[in-house]
Swiss-Prot record:
Residues 206-219 have a biased composition (Basic and acidic residues). It is found in: Cytoplasmic vesicle membrane; Cell membrane. It is a single-pass membrane protein. Interacts with CLTA. Signal peptide: none annotated. Keywords: Cell membrane, Cytoplasmic vesicle, Endocytosis, Membrane, Transmembrane, Transmembrane helix. This is Neuron-specific vesicular protein calcyon. Residues 1-23, 189-226 are annotated as: Disordered. Residues 110-226 are cytoplasmic. It comes from the Eukaryota. Residues 1-88 are extracellular. Expressed exclusively in neurons (at protein level). In all age groups, expressed at significantly higher levels in the medial prefrontal and orbital frontal cortices of spontaneously hypertensive rats (SHR), a model of attention deficit-hyperactivity disorder, than Wistar Kyoto (WKY) animals. In the motor cortex, dorsal striatum and nucleus accumbens, expression is significantly elevated in SHR only in younger animals. Coiled coil: none annotated.
Length: 226
């Protein structure tokens, strides 16, 4: 420690000295410091001044104003922006459901179901009456429309048949009509008349028969007196 008021002259018996030297010896080496002197005081408010330089061209100014207007409109109706994606999702779901229903109707409903009175056979709705009638038929023939015509019994014939006599005469007349001579026509008519009376046709021309008739008439009286 340093003792206050001590002299460093090294001569304790000497009391002479200047007043200035005595004053310097009496000043302490370490003096206490005040804390307020170490921390400066800060002001309560600070004002900062800045300066900015910018220029707007006539072409960029309306674009910026338009963007600001669009942002203002978008921010003013936030609910409309939320409803738009929801409406799109609902429309997409409805379209998908419609496609599924159409595929179901085309693949399953129409192919594997038949109305009342019909039976499903080979993925085709056929009436029960036809199914009972054509049970023993081939499936390929059963599908065709001509199956009913082909399966119709041929023994049933509607209408009356022509008599044999008239049928023969008609066929004979049709065959002889192709000839060129009128004698053939007369023979055919005579044959038809003979067939109608029940006699067999002679097959000779009419002129020859007329020549033979007088001879037979002469022979008959000549034979009677005998």
């Amino acid at each position: 420690m340093v003792k206050l008021g001590c002299s460093f002259s090294g001569k304790p018996g000497k009391e002479t000295g200047d007043q200035d030297g005595a004053a310097m010896d009496s000043v302490p080496l370490i003096s206490p410091l005040d804390v307020s002197q170490l921390q400066p005081s800060f002001p309560d408010q600070v004002v900062i001044k800045t300066q900015t330089e910018y220029q707007l061209t006539s072409a960029d100014q309306p674009k910026k104003f338009a963007d600001l207007e669009g942002q203002r409109l978008a921010c003013s109706h936030p609910e409309e922006g939320r409803r738009l994606p929801t409406a799109r999702m609902i429309a997409f779901a409805m379209a998908l459901l419609g496609c599924v229903l159409i595929m179901y109707k085309a693949i399953w409903y129409d192919q594997f179901t038949c109305p009342d009175g019909f039976l499903l056979r080979h993925k085709i709705c056929t009436p029960l009456t036809l199914e009972m009638y054509y049970t023993e038929m081939d499936p390929e023939r059963h599908r065709s429309i001509l199956a009913a015509i082909g399966a119709y019994p041929l023994s049933r014939k509607h209408g009356t048949e022509m008599p044999a006599i008239w049928g023969n005469s008609y066929r004979a007349g049709k065959e002889e009509h192709k000839g060129t001579t009128p004698a053939a026509m007369t023979v055919s008519t005579a044959a038809a008349a003979a067939a109608a009376e029940g006699n067999e046709p002679s097959g000779k021309p009419l002129d020859m028969r007329e020549k033979e008739d007088p001879q037979k008439a002469e022979d008959v009286p000549s034979q009677s007196p005998k």
